């Protein structure tokens, strides 16, 4: 019998309440996971409401089969394609709210066979959809040291990126790295200084995972897609878990909340004057988890929830 892994949804009520759900509205849960947000959204919907859930993890899609509700449907695919899914259903401009819970889920981290965690030994995979793309082991085997170092520095902000990258390449010449424990031990040995209360492999594992799954590109495409499909006054609710994710979300909301920028002191054309009111989003707010939530679920500690509202054209 397959082992089940518990997932505690972070900022559950806050993220869903921020959608300002209408009973007959149409909503998207772009990261189904184990369905915590989806089930709560469904509880707020009336008989005419609809919820479209998306996840690229086959295990998450399988978990969605437990929801027997005519108002609910699940798509196996990346949330970066949400605009395409909406267009296929003729719902562009009719979506009343979109929720995105970014990053890796607890079941993915806790299942050693998925290869996301340095705390549990398993195959070095890290793909959110194991049926697509190359695994972390395959990439590390074929990548140059400079490329590995760039990934570790860019996506993990790892100060010892070059040392770790050289160690990985040298190890792979002797014996292929295929297990998470072996990689974690190699990284620990390559780091001359350790951060207090943080495993030395934390940043590198995050960086490799982000790269393997193109996570930051996926977020940018999903946000642009959300802007295309939201109805006037539709809400966007996004939970991020580290600074790289939150930076993208914050920048996107700020960019579309300001409207076109014209250098000060320059005369404006009639077209530019008209465009000055051309903002497409309104920043609604930002929330952090409460102390009690962090106490019950330490993984919530770094989470940030941001809201935005689609403005009428």
From Swiss-Prot:
Binding-site residues for S-adenosyl-L-methionine, renumbered to this chain: 35-37, 55, 79, 101, 108
Compartments, as annotated in UniProt: Cytoplasm
A GO biological process held by the record: rRNA base methylation
Catalyzed reactions per annotation: cytidine(1402) in 16S rRNA + S-adenosyl-L-methionine = N(4)-methylcytidine(1402) in 16S rRNA + S-adenosyl-L-homocysteine + H(+)
InterPro entries given in the database record: RsmH (IPR002903), SAM-dep_MeTrfase_MraW_recog (IPR023397), SAM-dependent_MTases_sf (IPR029063)
Domain of life of the organism encoding this protein: Bacteria
Keywords: Cytoplasm, Methyltransferase, rRNA processing, S-adenosyl-L-methionine, Transferase
Molecular functions (GO terms): rRNA (cytosine-N4-)-methyltransferase activity
EC number(s) per entry: 2.1.1.199
GO CC annotation: cytoplasm
NCBIfam families recorded: 16S rRNA (cytosine(1402)-N(4))-methyltransferase RsmH
Its job: Specifically methylates the N4 position of cytidine in position 1402 (C1402) of 16S rRNA.
Protein family according to the UniProt entry: Belongs to the methyltransferase superfamily. RsmH family.
Protein name: Ribosomal RNA small subunit methyltransferase H
Organism, scientific name: Musicola paradisiaca (strain Ech703) (Dickeya paradisiaca)
Organism ancestry: Bacteria, Pseudomonadati, Pseudomonadota, Gammaproteobacteria, Enterobacterales
């Amino acid at each position: 019998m397959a082992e089940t892994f518990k997932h505690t949804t972070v900022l559950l009520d806050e993220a869903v309440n921020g959608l300002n759900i209408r009973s007959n509205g149409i909503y998207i849960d772009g990261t189904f996971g184990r369905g915590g947000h989806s089930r709560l959204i469904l509880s707020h919907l009336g008989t005419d409401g609809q919820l479209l859930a998306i996840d690229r993890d086959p295990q998450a899609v399988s978990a969605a089969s437990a929801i027997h509700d005519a108002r609910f449907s699940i798509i196996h695919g990346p949330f970066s394609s949400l605009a395409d899914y909406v267009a296929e259903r003729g719902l562009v401009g009719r979506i009343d709210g979109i929720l995105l819970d970014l990053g890796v889920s607890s079941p993915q981290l806790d299942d050693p066979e998925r290869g996301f965690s340095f705390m549990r030994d398993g195959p070095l995979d890290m793909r959110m959809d194991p049926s697509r793309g190359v695994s972390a082991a395959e990439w590390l085997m074929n990548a140059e040291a400079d490329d590995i170092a760039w990934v570790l520095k860019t996506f993990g902000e790892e100060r010892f990126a070059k040392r770790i990258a050289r160690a990985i390449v040298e190890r792979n010449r002797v014996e292929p790295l295929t297990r998470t424990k072996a990689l974690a031990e190699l990284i620990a040995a390559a780091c001359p200084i350790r951060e207090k209360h943080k495993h030395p492999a934390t940043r590198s594992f995050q960086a490799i995972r982000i790269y393997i799954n193109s996570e930051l590109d996926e977020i940018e495409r999903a946000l642009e897609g959300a802007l295309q499909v939201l109805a006037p006054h539709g809400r966007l609710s996004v939970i991020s878990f580290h600074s790289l994710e939150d930076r993208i979300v914050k920048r996107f909301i700020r960019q579309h909340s300001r409207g076109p920028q014209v250098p000060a002191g320059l005369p404006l054309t009639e077209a530019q004057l008209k465009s000055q009111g051309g903002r497409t989003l309104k920043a609604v707010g930002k929330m952090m988890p409460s102390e009690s939530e962090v106490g019950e679920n330490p993984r919530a500690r770094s989470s940030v929830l941001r809201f935005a509202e689609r403005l009428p054209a």
